[in-house]
């Protein structure tokens, strides 16, 4: 593992300062603290933010690279947002994937997540959606270390135009783990460890997923809602389904691929959506998930690609999503809920 795999240069948080407002004028950049995971035990209750600078998985998936530059640009958009909570935020730095060393950097990212979770809920800023395998691996490592006797029921909720259930190993083709494979990798992990696989994909596009992927989703009993079905007429029904999904799980892992939003809202992604799902449409589902903050241990935001952004609007969208999640996590009970 090279020295470059973790940023030695810390992100410099800065932004507007309204001295006349005192503490009531605080913004994210005022409260965030650089912290090592080894120091979190001494820290007060808060929320950790970790960057994962990677687009190696996107390249392997034949996508448009650029997401590697995303974490610090999301931080920059996040810095000036107002912060109304007493809970601090901790910046754990950024894991960097160089030279297609995806598996090694995913392992490093997972280790940091597993070290942070005993003390704080964590938000990971990607990076391509290969970050999802690192995120779940860190969550799994946390449970195996701290609750080895239990098999946690983890609900994975993915807002995404794609299932990301592609094969990551095959005798018929030369395939590798990529941004298109993480939830298939997670399924294989759950199968090997006799854990239940609870996966929901909301906003999936029929035009962007082949019959093979829909068949795979059906085989794995994935609960999915297509982009064309996510509308105000169907809100009540799908929110009820989401409630059942949440009720069936002890813990939640939320992952948001920014390509679920329309290209007009999120142009800065590898695979922009011609249709997509509006933020207003997704908001009630996100609010329902965040209501269960004591189940929500981990979240990540994936696929921001600054190479194709317009006036940083996708960065601001990612930052607002991070802000929404952090606000909910900041009110989380500090003591971990027991596994049922």
From Swiss-Prot:
It is an enzyme of class 3 (hydrolase). The lineage of its organism: Bacteria, Pseudomonadati, Pseudomonadota, Gammaproteobacteria, Vibrionales. Pathway: Amino-acid degradation; L-histidine degradation into L-glutamate; L-glutamate from N-formimidoyl-L-glutamate (hydrolase route): step 1/1. Mn(2+) 1 binds at residues 129, 160, 164, 257. InterPro entries: HutG, Ureohydrolase, Ureohydrolase_dom_sf, Ureohydrolase_Mn_BS. Belongs to the arginase family. HAMAP family: Formimidoylglutam (MF_00737). It comes from the Bacteria. GO terms for molecular function: agmatinase activity; formimidoylglutamase activity; manganese ion binding. This is Formimidoylglutamase. The gene is hutG. Keywords: Histidine metabolism, Hydrolase, Manganese, Metal-binding. GO terms for biological process: L-histidine catabolic process to glutamate and formamide; L-histidine catabolic process to glutamate and formate; putrescine biosynthetic process from arginine, via agmatine. Catalyzes the conversion of N-formimidoyl-L-glutamate to L-glutamate and formamide. Its cofactor is Mn(2+). Binds 2 manganese ions per subunit. Pfam families: Arginase (PF00491). Mn(2+) 2 binds at residues 160, 162, 257, 259. Its EC number is 3.5.3.8. It catalyses: N-formimidoyl-L-glutamate + H2O = formamide + L-glutamate.
